[in-house]
Amino acid sequence: MNYKISIIVPFFYKEKIVGENIPDFDLLSFNKCLSAIFKSKYKNYEVILVSDNSSPSSIKLTKKYPYKLIKLKKNNGAANARNQGAKLASGQILVFLDSDVEIKDNSLTIINNYNNKKNNVGILQGVYSHKPNYNSMTQYVHSYQCYHVFFETKKKKYTETLCTCFVAIKKKYFFKVKGFNSNFSGAETEDLDLGYRLMEKNHKIQLEQRLKTIHHTNYGILYFIKKIVSRHTSEMKMYLRNKKDIFKRTQQLSHTPVLISIILIAIKILIIFGNFFYKIPNFNEILISLIFLFILTNIKFLKFLLNSKGFLVAVRSAFYMFFHFFLLMMCIVFGILDFYVFRNKY
């Protein structure tokens, strides 16, 4: 059976105006995303673009492609945009794709063939490739995602991580859990939340290594900080809303090396801070030992980087990783404060 596949791509773009914050959107990457879709060998599909109150110029770019377009008058976030796209979809399978992600020409064929098998999964999760090789920070981020989110689960058949970079879901399962939670105002953890609710209904998420994508995002330091703080503060609050699952179901914090690394960084900060008030014996030796333990804890990931990206990227990534885990530690603090003190549940 050739299932009809509805590909839903939300996007948000505003013209650059002096004094206005510019959203994270790249018109060139958007064009690559659309071009890749329409090169698909599988032809029984439709494309639904959801403009989340974007500027007209981004819509003009897409005129050469056949698609359905939804123009939202108000920017309410990716969760709401994807829900609106799903309501218009006529396919039996929904594919959610980020606007800066490029898929392979056989991806839709793989999705259709899989759904012809008798199983209770109904959800296929795509994965990031190592490409493209922009700056060293971008290479670190892509490698981290490949390793901690996807590579570590390569030997497993299923995953608890649903990521809307590229995921295929049977439409009946999607609406069974009422779609994405539109309380998430930005592009935060609405995908993880949907994955958890699907799993609660006994729908498994299969990690499909053949569904490799190219993620066209170039990370700078400020963009990196913004994305980490936004997503993982929201992630922490999600765990607090579902306290019974806080240890059972996590994305990054469940990985033992990540958790140990965060604890080591917290200890190091406490020791440095405490040394200002009380001279700690063997202070330098303790710090060196903590750094050694940090590297040892993440040695498999660093070897993974060394083999895939080379020596220089691996060395730089050790520093990025320390900063990354420091931000994760701060996100835990921010999330707890925002949830309990400021009463912000989302």
Model region roles, listed by residue range:
Residues 27-44:
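Short, acidic, metal-binding catalytic loop of nucleotide-sugar glycosyltransferases
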Residues 36, 51-59, 98-102:
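A conserved acidic beta->alpha catalytic loop
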Residues 72-89:
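Glycine-rich, basic loop-to-helix element that forms the pyrophosphate-binding segment
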Residues 102, 106-138, 216:
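Conserved donor NDP-sugar-binding/catalytic core segment of glycosyltransferases
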Residues 181-186, 190-247:
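Catalytic donor/gating beta->alpha subdomain of glycosyltransferases that bind UDP-sugars
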Residues 221-286, 306-315, 346:
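Basic/Trp-rich segment in TM-proximal cytosolic loops or flexible interdomain/linker regions
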